Amino acid sequence: AAACLEFDPQKANLAYAGADIYLMPSKSEPCGLSQIIAMRFGTVPVVNATGGLKDTVWPYDPSSEQGRGFTFQSYNADDFLAAIDRSLQLFYDEPEKWARLSEADMSIDSSWKLPAQEYMELYKKAIG
């Protein structure tokens, strides 16, 4: 057996695209891009609601179909497993909702266009 110790972006993209769920139980995460990349490929994230993960993965509510993934608040195995269980319940019991969540995640605009416009507006207000 051999180990591949160098990063291959094509293989990474295949892994993102081939997965249904992306697990990211980071204890802390200033920003994080991998959950955004996962969503772009339609892979639903399960994350600890901390730092940038909390800013980019809003908790999914099956009744309103709002949200971007599944989150947990306390950094422990039980809460992480509960979030995984919620995601699997939707995946197996309501596949049509799962498909809509995955498609909605793929449609997220994660470009710099909107943030750049917002910063420009702030700068314009600051200088009068």
What is each model feature region?
Residues 9, 14-107:
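Catalytic binding pocket for nucleotide-activated donors in carbohydrate/polymer assembly enzymes
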Residues 1-11:
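Nucleotide-activated donor-binding/catalytic signature segment of Leloir-type glycosyltransferases, i.e.
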Residues 112-128:
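C-terminal alpha-helical cap of glycosyltransferases
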